[in-house]
A protein has these predicted regions:
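Short pre-active-site segment immediately N-terminal to the catalytic Zn-binding motif
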Residues: 167-183
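Short, ordered, surface-exposed loop/turn motifs in non-cytosolic proteins
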Residues: 1-10, 32, 286
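Structured interaction patches on ligand/partner-binding surfaces of diverse proteins
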Residues: 44-86
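Short Pro-Gly-centered beta-turn/loop motif in secreted/extracellular proteins
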Residues: 26-36
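Short, acidic Ser/Thr/Gly-rich low-complexity loop/linker segments typical of extracellular
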Residues: 7-24
Length: 328
């Protein structure tokens, strides 16, 4: 869960805890004490399993995002104190008119779902730290200058002296904090980079394009992972004026333009069909995430060849001999 802190009148931390999966928390402080609650946009667990995921504001010196509640007196009896991270959206104005406190926690919510998928198959996993940078000033650009919000696009970035995820937040242009598939897609790239291996060239790509096989695999993998983590094969990405437009596609769709190993749609449809348990008339394999995770973090990561669909699927067929014909 996220970190919840009790602060005294001087801003010092007098108690700290973490929320459970439902957002519940418990803190013990002295009676009749002035207290302010602060919720930090971070999920941290030391030991095994372990992880450290933090949302920061790249336009504010990478300050950790947090929600600060109102001050209250702890009294002499147990209290229930609920905090709400507001979206900042005013329906009547069709605009954000106040602080967008919910954004960082919406991002962490998708990270949480993605993490659960990993823990289901790797319950003792120790996952490398990840910093997720989000700001309402983050906008599409042609250059990368995160200090002022120029992040090109929502992306998992390795280079420019950074290694982490950057998320768009520009109102009426492109906001991605609530686009769970987009966040999970980039988390898939994090998994490739930190738990496995990627030889992707990066750069521009579309779901219909003929691509370098390394790029096609990386993007197709992350599309498929997003559907697995979110639990929905319909990929959705909102954008535009009042965030009213959307780009969508179904990763389970096997009718693909430019079908082949050089096409990310081909890759994501194959991987998702291996994973899912829904027989759609094309696939009958329901292997779940385990074999795919094992492959991504072992033989695919160690291949002497460049990473592509060919460095994962053949070994999956070896591990799933009863499904070889279905995979083909």
């Amino acid at each position: 869960g996220v970190t919840v802190e009790a602060l005294d009148g001087g801003g010092g931390v007098i108690a700290s805890s973490a929320t459970d999966s439902s957002g519940n928390y418990a803190l013990t402080v002295s009676p009749q004490t002035g207290v302010t609650l602060r919720v930090r946009a971070e999920m941290i667990r030391a030991g095994t399993p372990g992880w450290k995921f933090r949302v920061v504001d790249n336009t504010d010196g990478d300050a950790l995002s947090a929600l600060l509640g109102s001050s209250f007196d702890s009294g002499t009896e147990d209290l229930i104190v609920n905090l709400n991270a507001g979206s900042g959206w005013e329906p009547s104005a069709q605009a954000y008119t106040s602080t967008r406190s919910a954004g960082p926690f919406a991002i962490l919510d998708t990270v949480y779902d993605s993490l659960q998928l990993l823990l289901e198959v790797d319950p003792d996993g120790v996952f490398p730290g990840l910093v997720l940078s989000w700001s309402p000033l983050n906008r599409p650009s042609t250059t990368f200058d995160p200090d002022v919000g120029d992040i090109i696009s929502t992306a998992y970035v390795v280079g420019f002296g950074v290694r982490g995820m950057f998320v768009l937040g520009a109102e009426d242009v492109d906001t991605d904090e609530y686009d769970a598939h987009v966040i999970a897609h980039e988390f898939g790239h994090y998994m490739e980079d930190r738990l496995g291996r990627t030889d992707s060239t990066g750069g521009f790509h579309t779901i219909t394009a003929r691509l370098d096989p390394r790029l096609a695999f990386s993007e197709g993998w992350s599309n498929a992972f997003s559907a697995m983590a979110v639990g929905d094969p319909l990929y959705k990405d909102s954008r535009g004026l009042v965030q009213a437009l959307a780009f969508t596609f179904n990763v389970e769709n096997n009718t693909v333009i430019n079908q082949g190993w050089y096409n990310e749609s081909s890759v994501h449809s194959v991987l998702y069909d291996i994973f899912d348990d829904a027989a759609d008339g094309v696939d009958a394999t329901a292997a779940g995430f385990g074999p795919i995770y094992e492959g991504m973090t072992t033989w695919h990561a160690r291949t002497e060849a460049l990473t592509s669909i060919f460095s994962l699927v053949p070994e999956l067929k070896n591990r799933l001999p009863a499904d070889t014909a279905n995979i083909d």
